[in-house]
Amino acid sequence: MPQPSFMAPGALVRAAASAFVLAAASSAVLAQGTAYVSSEKDNALTMIDLATLAVKGTIPTCKRARHIQLTPERQIMVACTDSNQADLIDPASGKSVRRIALGDEPEAFDLSPDGKVIYVSNEDAGEASFIDTASGKKLRSVKVGAEPEGVKVSADGKTLYVTSEVASLVHVIDTATGKVVKNIKAGKRPRRMAITPDGKELWITNELGASVSIVSTATHEVIDTLKFEVKGARAEDITPVGIQMTSDGKRAFVGLGRANHVAFIDVASRKVGSLVLVGKRAWNVTLDKAQARLYVVNGLSDDVTVVDVAGAKAIKSVPVGRVPYGLVIVE
């Protein structure tokens, strides 16, 4: 008969302490930091504590806060469409430190890798503007298709991609010359983009095409199209917009708009693995640093759905400002 094994009291204490530390460390991965959510109607950012998943305050900003992004200096930059400005906010103090003119109707932007240039889509003018971050001066404007929105810069900073919603095009712009070098025919009403970490593919969400166009960055040709289906949802309600990839490039997450779901996609096979029910009009999506939780901004239910990535399950809905648009995380 096997003899029972016993752990010495000291070893038992050490094991328990070790388990506690590991559990605390695991929890800390999820618990540190703050999510900042822009709101189109409240002219403010809502702050969500990542430890408690509770709202801990708001920060006033300029009018109709939309696209939001971290600068290389870890400041928060938010485009305010009705103020024609970017608001630069210091997360440590929670205060605006500077406002930068972005031209008429700025909706989305991206930053050069060094943060020295802001590339912004000006919807009414049908232009992409290059803004010097330090001086706030416009360096140039590039004429693009009607209603430009999504803006994405390549990792080397040499190529700028801008979507045109009306023309169903993605314009490929040389950042050194400001010249449009190619127009890519995407799906209907292209909105946002993600570049795979290896730089080889550009993924474009097509809001009215219920799809993602996949483009080779070597040839700037569409090489595949991923179509979405959601059981019980009308085809016209499947309106993909926000997209983000994991740092290893293996998975992509897409907010499916009025279908009220977020899609988990295997990048290699280009197949949807899971569909997670979230709030109304799932718009933009953001992963935390550990890539353990996905934060989904829901524009019509005025909340953020927190999704456990491993379990592909919504774990909490956090009420935020009216018509929330984008979200960044400072950890």
Predicted segments with their positions:
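Bacterial N-terminal signal peptides that target proteins for export
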Residues: 2-17
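Cleavable N-terminal signal peptides
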Residues: 18-19, 29
